[in-house]
Amino acid sequence: MPTVISASVAPRTGAEPMSPGPIAQAAQDKGTEAGGGNPSGIYSAIISRNFPIIGVKEKTFEQLHKKCLEKKVLFVDPEFPPDETSLFYSQKFPIQFVWKRPPEICENPRFIVGGANRTDICQGDLGDCWFLAAIACLTLNKRLLFRVIPHDQSFTENYAGIFHFQFWRYGDWVDVVIDDCLPTYNNQLVFTKSNHRNEFWNALLEKAYAKLHGSYEALKGGNTTEAMEDFTGGVTEFFEIKDAPRDMYKIMKKAIERGSLMGCSIDDGTNMTYGTSPSGLKMGELIERMVRNMDNSRLRDSDLIPEGCSDDRPTRMIVPVQFETRMACGLVKGHAYSVTGLEEALYKGEKVKLVRLRNPWGQVEWNGSWSDSWKDWSYVDKDEKARLQHQVTEDGEFWMSYDDFIYHFTKLEICNLTADALESDKLQTWTVSVNEGRWVRGCSAGGCRNFPDTFWTNPQYRLKLLEEDDDPDDSEVICSFLVALMQKNRRKDRKLGANLFTIGFAIYEVPKEMHGNKQHLQKDFFLYNASKARSRTYINMREVSERFRLPPSEYVIVPSTYEPHQEGEFILRVFSEKRNLSEEVENTISVDRPVKKKKNKPIIFVSDRANSNKELGVDQETEEGKDNTSPDKQAKSPQLEPGNTDQESEEQRQFRNIFRQIAGDDMEICADELKNVLNRVVNKHKDLKTQGFTLESCRSMIALMDTDGSGRLNLQEFHHLWKKIKTWQKIFKHYDTDQSGTINSYEMRNAVKDAGFHLNNQLYDIITMRYADKYMNIDFDSFICCFVRLEGMFRAFNAFDKDGDGIIKLNVLEWLQLTMYA
């Protein structure tokens, strides 16, 4: 019986380290040995042939910057233009924003004023507090900050209106280039701004992140860990504070010491991501509130800067339009906070554990014990105050006791820069393997274990845990590892209607007799074997990760969406303390009853398609158990050769007579005649419920069975085709269990295997895309056409693979003849 897997809304964990150590280095390999780990390995032939349609390679920041300086022009980004298309996609904005460059907004604009720090960040009206909370955490780690935000940029030296930032994207670091045009209203920045009016690094960083996801609106609502991962490539872990371990404070302390990024939040009871408006609030209402907010914050005339004075005063701020729920204690539900420090302070002779948090609004703070204006600060020693940097200022940052923290907050997210367990006192070197894959509707999007008929079709990844942990205090022979599953590009595709899928994974132990066997595990295996481990829940967040401890062995990881038929891409990473091997399960591509090759005899290129099809006779003789001694003799079947009737059986004689009636005296049939004879036969099989073969299908059959390049089929060729169709018809009926005249595309895997073809996951995906209808069903005509093409292409490859090394070399004429006549 399938186990019930809960589906819930919860933040996710996991990602890959960015530091140039062993983890980052290993990640560069991306599991290329598996065949499915390299992103170019997914339908690479199809993607490559269509690449010229997409366009040329983008120019780098350095090239664009140099070009602008040479031409003495300011850069305008054509990919993310300063207009409404870069702002919102769900509806048109009712008022006109003015896009301005920083020198047009204020005098003496600066990229960074006095160093980038957490107090620079003030949230605008976008609802991206999750992103800004992550920026505040990022400023605490200067090494990471300098990677994301190259500091050699300014509005004076070599200024050309162009800036760039770097983000981690699914295993790679990408450089995002933007112009410095920013949306303004009443000469004020609409979205993120700095505490200093003439500082713009954070507004430009937000714009680069918006470009990465397609628009500013795409940033509305999210989880802090998502941005943390994109800033670091780190591994994120998620804690429900009510279920947190007793030493949670120790875990948080070590996270701070190791440069990890931390965020927290308070559930608002709606299961919404941070900064997301209530479901009833439409984009139009958000826009109206934004306009009211901006009108209310318009500068007074007396606030104008006298001519010639520097415009580096603090920004005038108001609380932005928010939909989170503010509590009496000053905290806000459904809102993201940054954890910026942990300390212990002496208070009335006792040590008190403290947590420092920051609200990305830049104001609205905790008003309880240890808040800025707490009356009992007078009982705290002066030196302690200095150490805690206590000051009464409305900057959004505040202290609170750890006890109050765990009482009020419900979620804690920690983005680690390595996969070291924070409970451990020592740092280890972890190894990582990275695989990229996709769920394809109708083929490899099988859903979770609750759907046993399709679960087995999901991508599968073999995990070999080869060595146990080095832990002298642990008597168990155990391997520690972390699995992180991340779905790709869902935020960017929001404007196309995409939402985050509910995802998770299960881990099964592979039986010893199947170790080293890379075959895709079948349905029966999962029906009769329970998982050894799995993600705690399926969640509709970008990533889910989990730590496990299992004995050394061989396992299979099955990542999936909760519901079947949901199509998308993902990245699966496995971190372990010791050496491991994680690779996608890929069947060896082959066909049963391999055709014997003609040794030392080159193909004469009258029609290489026809020459490759001369192996038909060999295949036929092999099936009939005949002696295959002479390739030339095998090329024709003597029993069905015109004029040779002495050895024919009664059945063969009847077959010849029927064929003569159709073909006439020349004993050859064209595509129209083939269509008539095949449809005359299949129409008698009412259970197939087919409308018959199309003319195009019959043309393909002739091309793939033609041995002499005549464009017609003789008796022998037709006999071979007919035998194949009868065999494939039996397979089709076997899988057409409901007698609908179609088979489910998920069952095509087994049907292809029963026909003697062994393919990998990519080819199964391609078959589904090519032959299934919109309901993911394959009718009899498409079924036969698929098998005819498979047989013909295997046979053609075999004929051209003269030395049997699995590689063929064709010139352009050979390639076009082979593919056009198919």
Curated annotation (Swiss-Prot):
It is found in: Cytoplasm; Nucleus, Nucleolus. Residues 419-587 are annotated as: Domain III. One of its GO terms (cellular component) is nucleus. Homodimer; via EF-hand domain 4. Interacts with TTN/titin. Interacts with CMYA5; this interaction, which results in CMYA5 proteolysis, may protect CAPN3 from autolysis. Interacts with SIMC1. Interacts with UTP25; the interaction is required for CAPN3 translocation to the nucleolus. It comes from Bos taurus (Bovine). Residues 651-822 are annotated as: Domain IV. This is Calpain-3. Keywords: Calcium, Cytoplasm, Hydrolase, Metal-binding, Nucleus, Protease, Repeat, Thiol protease. Residues 588-650 are annotated as: Linker. SUPFAM superfamilies: Calpain large subunit, middle domain (domain III) (SSF49758), Cysteine proteinases (SSF54001), EF-hand (SSF47473). One of its GO terms (molecular function) is peptidase activity.
